[in-house]
Amino acid sequence: MALYEHVLLARQDISQQQVDALVEQFKGVLEANGGKFGKVENWGLRPLTYRIKKNRKAYYTLVNIDAPAAAVAEMERQMRINEDVLRFLTVRVEEHEEGQSAMLTRRDDRRERDGDDRPRRREGGFDRGDRGDRGPRRPRDTEAGEGA
């Protein structure tokens, strides 16, 4: 049997218990066709990048699956029919990841930000002083400036 990672996006206006019931429903479909569910991760209610079927948020759920292709195809067919499922994606993998997925692990290596992505300028406001990369200024032509 092949290994798959499956991500499911459910509508925002249903409860977390209903999302869990959906996952159990699809688990039953998969097991009836000879497949097995592995790890199930609920990522919770997260904002969508763009609106999908008039929804701005969705419940994300990741499922590790060990099943034949026919069982996965039947589960996906059932998901297309269900109105509570906004989107899903099934990807075949060589092996399942151990531990938490990348979405749930905190990134401690991310530097602390003070709400500003720009590098700090020298103190003193707008005056940057001598830039150092330019040579000295040429003298002004005083005769041309007076007549104009």
UniProtKB/Swiss-Prot annotation:
What does the record give under GO molecular function? Answer: small ribosomal subunit rRNA binding; structural constituent of ribosome
Q: Which GO terms describe its biological process?
A: translation
* Keywords carried by this UniProt record: Ribonucleoprotein, Ribosomal protein, RNA-binding, rRNA-binding
The record lists the membrane-crossing segments as none
The UniProt entry's GO CC annotations, sorted and at most eight, read: cytosolic small ribosomal subunit
Entry's Pfam families?
Ribosomal_S6
InterPro entries named among the record's database cross-references: Ribosomal_bS6, Ribosomal_bS6_sf, Ribosomal_S6_plastid/chlpt, Transl_elong_EF1B/ribsomal_bS6
Region of interest (Disordered), residue spans: 96-148
> Which NCBIfam families does this chain map to?
S6
- What is the annotated role of this protein in its UniProt record? Binds together with bS18 to 16S ribosomal RNA.
Entry similarity comment: Belongs to the bacterial ribosomal protein bS6 family.
Q: Which named protein is this?
A: Small ribosomal subunit protein bS6
